[in-house]
Protein backbone atom coordinates (compact mmCIF):
# COMPACT_ATOMS: atom_id res chain seq x y z
CA UNK A 1 0.00 0.00 0.00
CA UNK A 2 1.52 3.31 -1.10
CA UNK A 3 0.17 6.46 0.55
CA UNK A 4 1.26 9.80 -0.93
CA UNK A 5 0.45 13.22 0.61
CA UNK A 6 -1.61 15.70 -1.46
CA UNK A 7 1.09 18.39 -1.27
CA UNK A 8 4.85 18.15 -1.66
CA UNK A 9 7.69 20.67 -1.46
CA UNK A 10 9.92 19.92 -4.43
CA UNK A 11 11.97 21.62 -7.16
CA UNK A 12 10.03 23.58 -9.80
CA UNK A 13 11.50 23.84 -13.31
CA UNK A 14 9.27 26.79 -14.27
CA UNK A 15 10.96 29.93 -15.61
CA UNK A 16 9.67 32.09 -12.75
CA UNK A 17 10.60 29.66 -9.96
CA UNK A 18 13.63 27.41 -10.55
CA UNK A 19 13.66 26.61 -6.83
CA UNK A 20 11.87 24.38 -4.30
CA UNK A 21 8.20 25.33 -3.98
CA UNK A 22 4.96 23.74 -2.77
CA UNK A 23 3.34 21.44 -5.35
CA UNK A 24 -0.20 20.05 -5.56
CA UNK A 25 -0.12 16.28 -6.22
CA UNK A 26 -2.70 14.42 -8.33
CA UNK A 27 -2.64 11.03 -10.03
CA UNK A 28 -2.07 11.04 -13.80
CA UNK A 29 -4.90 9.61 -15.86
CA UNK A 30 -4.64 8.92 -19.59
CA UNK A 31 -6.88 11.08 -21.77
CA UNK A 32 -9.56 9.73 -24.08
CA UNK A 33 -8.05 8.31 -27.29
CA UNK A 34 -8.74 10.49 -30.33
CA UNK A 35 -10.79 9.08 -33.21
CA UNK A 36 -8.75 11.17 -35.63
CA UNK A 37 -5.24 9.89 -34.89
CA UNK A 38 -3.69 8.42 -38.04
CA UNK A 39 -3.45 4.88 -36.65
CA UNK A 40 -7.09 4.86 -35.51
CA UNK A 41 -8.30 6.20 -38.88
CA UNK A 42 -6.33 3.51 -40.71
CA UNK A 43 -7.57 0.79 -38.35
CA UNK A 44 -11.23 1.85 -38.69
CA UNK A 45 -10.95 1.96 -42.49
CA UNK A 46 -9.43 -1.53 -42.53
CA UNK A 47 -12.05 -2.92 -40.13
CA UNK A 48 -15.04 -1.58 -42.07
CA UNK A 49 -16.95 -3.87 -44.41
CA UNK A 50 -16.85 -7.66 -44.50
CA UNK A 51 -13.94 -9.80 -43.36
CA UNK A 52 -13.95 -9.85 -39.57
CA UNK A 53 -11.00 -8.86 -37.39
CA UNK A 54 -8.08 -7.72 -39.55
CA UNK A 55 -5.33 -7.18 -36.99
CA UNK A 56 -4.15 -9.45 -34.16
CA UNK A 57 -5.83 -8.90 -30.78
CA UNK A 58 -3.24 -8.96 -27.98
CA UNK A 59 -3.88 -11.65 -25.34
CA UNK A 60 -0.49 -12.45 -23.75
CA UNK A 61 -0.70 -9.88 -20.94
CA UNK A 62 2.35 -10.12 -18.68
CA UNK A 63 2.02 -7.31 -16.12
CA UNK A 64 -0.44 -7.29 -13.22
CA UNK A 65 0.11 -3.65 -12.20
CA UNK A 66 0.83 -0.30 -13.78
CA UNK A 67 3.39 2.24 -12.65
CA UNK A 68 1.80 5.11 -10.74
CA UNK A 69 2.47 8.52 -12.28
CA UNK A 70 2.11 11.64 -10.13
CA UNK A 71 1.23 15.01 -11.65
CA UNK A 72 2.88 17.81 -9.70
CA UNK A 73 1.49 21.33 -10.14
CA UNK A 74 3.44 24.27 -8.71
CA UNK A 75 1.17 26.49 -6.61
CA UNK A 76 3.23 29.59 -7.54
CA UNK A 77 3.60 29.41 -11.35
CA UNK A 78 1.16 26.54 -12.18
CA UNK A 79 3.88 24.59 -14.05
CA UNK A 80 3.08 20.88 -14.25
CA UNK A 81 5.60 18.05 -13.97
CA UNK A 82 5.18 14.30 -13.94
CA UNK A 83 6.91 11.83 -11.64
CA UNK A 84 6.73 8.05 -12.05
CA UNK A 85 6.65 5.85 -8.95
CA UNK A 86 7.32 2.13 -8.68
CA UNK A 87 4.66 -0.46 -9.42
CA UNK A 88 2.14 -1.12 -6.68
CA UNK A 89 -1.20 -2.89 -6.27
CA UNK A 90 -2.71 -0.35 -3.84
CA UNK A 91 -2.20 3.39 -4.25
CA UNK A 92 -3.71 6.08 -2.06
CA UNK A 93 -3.49 9.86 -2.34
CA UNK A 94 -3.72 11.86 0.87
CA UNK A 95 -4.80 8.97 3.09
CA UNK A 96 -4.46 8.78 6.87
CA UNK A 97 -0.95 8.25 8.23
CA UNK A 98 -0.47 4.81 9.75
CA UNK A 99 -0.32 4.46 13.55
CA UNK A 100 1.96 2.11 15.46
CA UNK A 101 0.56 -1.35 16.22
CA UNK A 102 -2.46 -0.99 13.93
CA UNK A 103 -3.59 -3.58 11.37
CA UNK A 104 -3.50 -2.75 7.64
CA UNK A 105 -6.84 -1.86 6.05
CA UNK A 106 -7.67 -1.83 2.34
From Swiss-Prot:
The biological processes this protein is annotated with in GO are: response to antibiotic; response to cycloheximide; translation
Q: Name one Pfam family in it.
A: Ribosomal_L44
Q: Which GO terms describe its cellular component?
A: ribonucleoprotein complex; ribosome
Q: Which UniProt keywords apply?
A: Antibiotic resistance, Cycloheximide resistance, Ribonucleoprotein, Ribosomal protein
Disulphide bonds in the chain: none
InterPro entries named among the record's database cross-references? Ribosomal_eL44, Ribosomal_LSU_eL42, Ribosomal_zn-bd
Highest taxon in the source lineage: Eukaryota
Q: Which GO terms describe its molecular function?
A: structural constituent of ribosome
Keyword Ribonucleoprotein found: yes
Question: What is the similarity comment for this entry?
Answer: Belongs to the eukaryotic ribosomal protein eL42 family.
Further remark: Confers resistance to cycloheximide, an inhibitor of polypeptide elongation.
Q: Which PANTHER family match?
A: 60S RIBOSOMAL PROTEIN L36A/L44
What's the protein called, per UniProt?
Answer: Large ribosomal subunit protein eL42
Amino acid sequence: MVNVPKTRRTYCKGKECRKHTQHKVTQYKAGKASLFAQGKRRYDRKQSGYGGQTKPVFHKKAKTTKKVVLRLECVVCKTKAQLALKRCKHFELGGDKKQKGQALQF
